[in-house]
């Protein structure tokens, strides 16, 4: 993924990415199976833990902070590491825009304590995860009063407009998903970004990748995704009404209302079309069949 972005943004191999990544709690199903989100599965797998070195994909967050099961400790440690390595950060982000904004809000509430950590080279006592403490302590290194003063000056300003650019001045873009339901967060991201481009690189779910944005520097309103037909078998269910109206109909599914039932019956009776028969300018609901034979209705495109 990072290789194709290198075509549009120079020098990504000359620094690090401050990507805020988290694991989620696992649950045990009635059958005794472990269920967890796909990203949690990936971060806990050997593919992530033992990934080969890639100069385009170096994180400021140690793996120990990403794999911390306590979300507050994980967030704190990842942001602290990102601040300490601010001069090396070339890109920042999270999976979703909402998650990245939660991190900014968390920083607003905790920057003073982080400055104290940097000034004294001591991790806060409430960080009790031993792996996190050890990993962050190594990154903190020696006391750094100059860095703590700089962060205090920027974060203590009356307005946080452009704070991302101020704290991480070499940042070339913010990588978060800002399409679909995440589009509502674009104005807030632009307020904090200081003019840094918002990059939405992919379209995916737990089942598979759907598409990639091959023009990553396009405006959020102009983002489009190129479908990856090798990831799953895609079919397209034509939607007669506009996107907003259809979304409302889907939300009322399962409610014992006759109009909803009629709309659902009508939807199930429609025929899907293959990719080659999709018409430009029309709306479709994506129907995905995975390699395991599981299929599901996803959402509109």
Predicted regions and their residues:
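Conserved structural elements of the adenylate-forming
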Residues: 1-8
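Active-site glycine/GP-rich loop and adjacent strand/helix microenvironment
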Residues: 11-300
